[in-house]
Structures are given as structure tokens and as C-alpha cells.
Amino acid sequence: MHELGIVFHIIRTVEDVARQNDVTRIRRVTLQLGEVSGVVESYLQDCWKWAAAKSKLLPGAVLTVETIPAVTVCEDCGQQYPTVQFGRTCPHCQSPRTHLLQGHEMLIKEIEAVETEPTAPERA
């Protein structure tokens, strides 16, 4: 299960960004995940819940996953098509000379911080 390693990497990245921006708590992390990335979302969510609970910045933080559809382009006819539906062979011209345009990526799209109450200025 490589999802745990992926979650650890996401958490390290989020914690680094939080420190750079003086954020003390994270509410939500939105991840864009390619349809053919090889990551199983349910495993990713289970690993996230376990690992986030152990982080000082992330207890209770939600991981939202947006799926990026896999799209392939044919080098012979130039047509684009849905990868999962048609595979590696172009449905337009039956050419095997195709390559994946999108759908393999994994990107942190958004980090939502918990707003902290501003401290009142001290009175003299």
C-alpha cells in the first residue's frame, strides 16, 4: 500500500506551507488525483485519517479528492479521447501511437486553514 507514503508526503508538504504562513491549524486539504494515477482513494482516505490525527496541525482535517479524468491523444489523427473507456488504441483511427495527456497527476490544489481569533492589543 503506497498510499500511506503518499499521505506522509502530503502532510509534510502541508506542514511546511503552514509553517511558512504562520498557520497553526488546517481544516481541509484538497487534492487533485488523476483517474489513472494508481492511487486507491479509499485507502488514501483511511491513511489520511490515521496520519492526520497524529499531526499537531491536522487533527480532524478533511482530505477532499477531486478526480482529474484521464485523456489520451492520438499521434496519428490528433484526436483526444477518454483513456479509461478506450485504452491505448485510438477509437477514431485504431492507431496504437497514443500518449496520456492528463490523468496521472497528483496535486495539492488547496489548503484551508482554521482562522484564529486576532489577539486584542494589550492595554497600558
Residue ranges and their predicted role:
Residues 32-36, 66-70, 109-111:
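Short loop/turn motifs enriched for small/polar and acidic residues
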Residues 58-68, 91-94:
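Short, conserved loop-to-beta-strand elements that form functional interface hotspots
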Residues 62-69, 79-85:
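Short, flexible, mixed-charge glycine/proline-rich loop motifs
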Residues 72, 88, 106:
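Cys/His-enriched microdomains
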Residues 82, 95-99:
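Short functional micro-motifs and their immediate structural scaffolds
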